[in-house]
């Protein structure tokens, strides 16, 4: 049943917000004065966890009711048309990382806090009464007061204009925007600023626990990104400022608040002198993602949450397009292939997965659609597909039309397709409808029929059990031979294979560039032809070959055993993209072996075979003038060599640790995680783990923290494992925002798995209370399913999670993840012997 939209009762035009935050008492007091148009009585205004002290309409007190289950204030205005509604309220300041909340950090041994906000999806209503729906755009004037101390500053969407005699900081009126994009923060902060060539103020803010140089990288990327987007979109950035704020506690990765973008520290700050290239790429893409939203999401906003993909999918594509423009030598589209494409293809093959666009009626269901592999990754693949069909000139022309016609308003997916269609003869809406409205993706079977004709068929691809509902897609084939641009039918006949092959002069392949969202199963004739010419393939083609074979093996359409020889063939590649694909596939072989079994010993020998020549070539130390490719290949090879228990690698890593034990943070960031992991696994005890945990608490360097966490959770020491689990609920050690990563690290560790699994089952109520209202909560289920692959764990997983299947935020995830584990259990049972035989043969 559809839930009533509050916007139908009242259209806000302007908010005057007066908010007073007291950190000591953990209270929020304020007034929300809303000017707008009354369309229905009673008027419905959102609130959550508030005490409503009074409501006035046009200066007169009126009757109201607070309806907690609807998160509503029901106001009998007695008027229609223009009205001013003034609501006085109070609310608690909580540690939930939603609404207005404190972030905690240490500086010179003292605990401190800054206050920040997180209002997406429906948490603005915890900060001030409002019509908390994307379509209810309005302007906002903010006056902010707090228990201010010397040296503290306040930030908001717009610049500060004055501090009044009562201590309220006043900010410029915003442009017309949605409530979920309002943001403010205050506390003791350091900053660095610059201006774009058009005069927009760019700033980066962080706590003083960080070294000033950690702000430099973000400042440079943010400035250049704003300039890039203004040119690409042919639409000016409409605000006077773009501030980037790192919050010590933040549930999401980052949030695109207009003019005041908030981030986890790990996704904004880095040491420019000692951060891996991969981490620099990651931080750059997070920043450019959020800044892409300043147009796509903020300037033009989805009309309702069922078009969330319109915000996220486009920003996800633009983060790569912009970074490629800013840093072309990074070859950032390769990262798109290894992260977004891989994530989308894996997730979208499970029966029961959501489509990109799905109907949402109840706000309780909104957070459940934030499936990053679908809304972000698959959605961005759809737009990459559109870009490859249109070309950049037509894309830019269509986007300019879109922004010109919808700026400061709301839009739907159809509005975007209509805009893009003005720049092309293609019916973009018709092509995209099949991809957005239905889940999954096709496998295209390419085969030479008995009559010698090359034929293509499409059907939905599943990993695990799946119900074939006869779905059909409009597939951009991207063929390297004479073939239709779009495959619309279930089956097509392309004519004589012999003629097509002769005309092409090379093996025939589909989805060249891996930009379309489908995989290909070639028959033996076509597959053998491709393998005969495999050395001529470029890195993306090789990645795609391994990717499709891996997925077909996961779907039991081919055997994993048949892929093992190809891993050996690609082992000497000088492409980090190919090496990534190689070890992504090799990692899947681990599920077929029992820990410490003879089969695992053989698998470790295979890893040694795959990595030893590369380790010998690259060594452990980064060489002056080394190529970016070699810098990025080294971590894969060192990790593989350590898994293989290569004695020389273990010795080399131990020596590096010993020589740098007094300053581990200064270790080269490209090798640091592997040095630390090796030490913990092969030479460490509970004492070392305790030392590294203290180091984790001490440092403010986000990437170093990640390395320390990876090392600590890899321990074999049972006493250390017990201590780690004991710290899961100690926010002074493990912040709630980082808890899922700690849990996943220990769960994936054979020695720590039982302790981690026992903890989440025993302390689920605590976990629910701590992070249960957050969109990231379901990740605890996702990562558990990602690790489990045995019948015993499947049984335990179902026993624990299936009773929770009616929780809206968790329901889809639980159902899907049962299928994920079931598919692995069935695959292992069917393939285990063949895979282990293939591994034994490869090392013979």
From Swiss-Prot:
- Catalysis performed (reactions): Release of an N-terminal amino acid, Xaa-|-Yaa- from a peptide, amide or arylamide. Xaa is preferably Ala, but may be most amino acids including Pro (slow action). When a terminal hydrophobic residue is followed by a prolyl residue, the two may be released as an intact Xaa-Pro dipeptide
Result of altering residue 342 to A: In strain: 53/7
Residues noted as binding substrate in the record, renumbered to the chain: 120, 253-257
SUPFAM superfamilies under this entry? Leukotriene A4 hydrolase N-terminal domain, Metalloproteases ('zincins'), catalytic domain
Q: Per UniProt, what does mutating residue 455 to R do?
A: In strain: 53/7
Q: Which domain of life is it from?
A: Bacteria
> Entry's Pfam families?
ERAP1_C, Peptidase_M1, Peptidase_M1_N
Show the active-site residues.
290
* Compartments, record wording: Cytoplasm
Q: Which residues bind Zn(2+)?
A: 289, 293, 312
> Mind naming one GO cellular-component term on file for this protein?
extracellular space
List residue numbers at the site (Transition state stabilizer): 376
Cofactor: record remark: Binds 1 zinc ion per subunit.
Q: Which cofactor does it need?
A: Zn(2+)
Per the record, the similarity remark reads: Belongs to the peptidase M1 family.
Outline what the protein does: Aminopeptidase N is involved in the degradation of intracellular peptides generated by protein breakdown during normal growth as well as in response to nutrient starvation.
Subunit arrangement?
Monomer.
Xref: PANTHER family:
PROTEASE M1 ZINC METALLOPROTEASE, PUROMYCIN-SENSITIVE AMINOPEPTIDASE-RELATED
Return the protein name: Aminopeptidase N
Q: Which organism is it from?
A: Lactobacillus helveticus
Source taxonomy:
Bacteria, Bacillati, Bacillota, Bacilli, Lactobacillales
């Amino acid at each position: 049943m559809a839930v009533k939209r509050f916007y139908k009762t009242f259209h806000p035009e302007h908010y005057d917000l007066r908010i007073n935050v007291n950190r000591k008492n953990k209270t929020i007091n304020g007034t929300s004065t809303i000017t707008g148009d009354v369309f229905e009585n009673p008027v419905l205004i959102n609130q959550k966890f508030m005490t409503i002290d009074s409501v006035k309409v046009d200066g007169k007190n009126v009757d109201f009711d607070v309806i907690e289950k609807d998160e509503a204030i029901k106001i009998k205005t007695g008027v229609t048309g223009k009205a001013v509604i003034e609501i006085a309220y109070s609310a608690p300041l909580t540690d939930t990382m939603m609404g207005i909340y404190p972030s905690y950090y240490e500086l010179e041994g003292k605990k401190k806090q800054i206050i920040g906000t997180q209002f997406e999806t429906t948490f603005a209503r915890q900060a001030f009464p409002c019509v908390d729906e994307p379509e209810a755009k309005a302007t906002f004037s903010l006056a902010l007061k707090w228990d201010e101390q010397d040296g503290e500053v306040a930030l908001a969407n717009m610049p500060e204009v004055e501090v009044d005699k009562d201590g309220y900081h006043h900010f410029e009126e915003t442009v017309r925007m949605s409530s979920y994009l309002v943001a403010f923060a205050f506390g003791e902060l350091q900053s660095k600023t610059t201006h774009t060539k058009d005069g927009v103020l760019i700033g980066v803010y962080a706590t003083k626990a960080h070294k000033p140089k950690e702000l430099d990288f973000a400042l440079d990327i943010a400035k250049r990104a704003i300039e890039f987007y203004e040119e690409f979109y042919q639409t000016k950035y409409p605000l006077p400022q773009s501030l980037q704020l790192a919050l010590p506690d933040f549930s999401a990765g980052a949030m695109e608040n207009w003019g005041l973008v908030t981030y986890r520290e790990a996704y904004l700050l880095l040491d420019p002198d000692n951060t891996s290239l991969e981490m620099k790429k990651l931080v750059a893409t997070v920043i450019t993602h959020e800044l892409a939203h300043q147009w796509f999401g903020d300037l033009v906003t989805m009309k309702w949450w069922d078009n969330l993909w319109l915000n996220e999918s486009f920003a996800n594509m633009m983060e790569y397009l912009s970074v490629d423009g800013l840093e072309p030598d990074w070859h950032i589209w390769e990262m798109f292939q290894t992260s977004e494409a891989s994530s989308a293809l894996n997730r979208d093959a499970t029966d029961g997965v959501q489509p990109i666009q799905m109907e949402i009626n109840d706000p309780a269901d909104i957070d459940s659609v934030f499936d990053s592999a679908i809304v972000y990754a698959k959605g961005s693949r759809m737009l990459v597909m559109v870009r490859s069909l249109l070309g950049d000139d037509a894309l830019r022309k269509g986007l300019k039309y879109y922004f010109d016609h919808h700026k400061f308003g709301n839009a739907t997916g159809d509005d975007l397709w209509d805009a893009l269609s003005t720049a092309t003869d293609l019916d973009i809406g018709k092509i995209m409808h099949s991809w957005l409205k239905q889940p999954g993706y096709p496998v295209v079977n390419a085969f030479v029929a008995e009559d010698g004709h090359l034929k293509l068929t499409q059907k939905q691809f599943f990993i695990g059990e799946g119900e074939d509902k006869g779905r059909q897609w409009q597939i951009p084939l991207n063929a390297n031979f004479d073939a239709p641009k779009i495959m619309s039918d279930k089956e097509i006949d392309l004519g004589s294979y012999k003629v097509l092959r002769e005309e092409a002069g090379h093996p025939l392949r589909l989805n060249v560039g891996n930009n379309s969202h489908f995989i290909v199963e070639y028959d033996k004739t076509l597959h053998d032809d491709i393998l005969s010419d495999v050395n001529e393939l470029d890195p993306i083609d090789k990645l795609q070959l391994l990717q499709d074979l891996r997925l077909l093996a996961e779907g039991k359409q081919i055997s994993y055993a048949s892929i093992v020889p190809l891993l050996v063939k690609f082992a000497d590649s000088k492409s980090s993209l190919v090496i990534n694909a190689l070890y992504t596939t090799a990692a899947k072989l681990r599920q077929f072996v029992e820990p410490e079994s003879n089969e695992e010993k053989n698998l470790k020998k295979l890893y040694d075979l795959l990595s030893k020549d590369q380790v010998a070539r690259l060594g452990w130390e980064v060489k002056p003038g080394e190529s970016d490719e070699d810098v990025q290949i080294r971590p894969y090879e060192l990790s593989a060599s350590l898994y293989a228990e290569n004695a020389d690698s273990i010795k080399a890593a131990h020596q590096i640790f010993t020589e740098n034990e007094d300053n581990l943070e200064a270790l080269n960031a490209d090798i640091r995680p592997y040095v630390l992991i090796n030490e913990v696994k092969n030479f460490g005890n509970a004492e070392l783990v305790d030392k590294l945990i203290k180091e984790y608490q001490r440092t403010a360097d986000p990437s170093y923290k990640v390395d320390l966490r990876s090392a600590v959770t890899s321990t074999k020491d049972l006493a250390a494992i017990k201590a780690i689990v004991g710290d899961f609920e100690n926010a002074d050690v493990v912040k709630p925002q980082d808890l899922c990563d700690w849990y996943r690290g220990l769960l994936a560790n054979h020695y720590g798995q039982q302790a981690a699994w026992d903890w989440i089952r025993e302390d689920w109520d605590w976990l629910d209370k701590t992070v249960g209202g957050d969109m990231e909560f379901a990740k605890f289920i996702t990562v558990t399913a990602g690790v489990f692959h045995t019948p015993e764990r499947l049984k335990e997983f179902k026993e624990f999670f299936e009773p929770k299947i009616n929780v809206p935020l968790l329901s889809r995830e639980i159902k899907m993840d049962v299928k994920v584990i079931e598919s692995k259990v069935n695959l292992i049972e069917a393939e285990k012997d063949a895979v282990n035989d293939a591994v034994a043969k490869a090392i013979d």
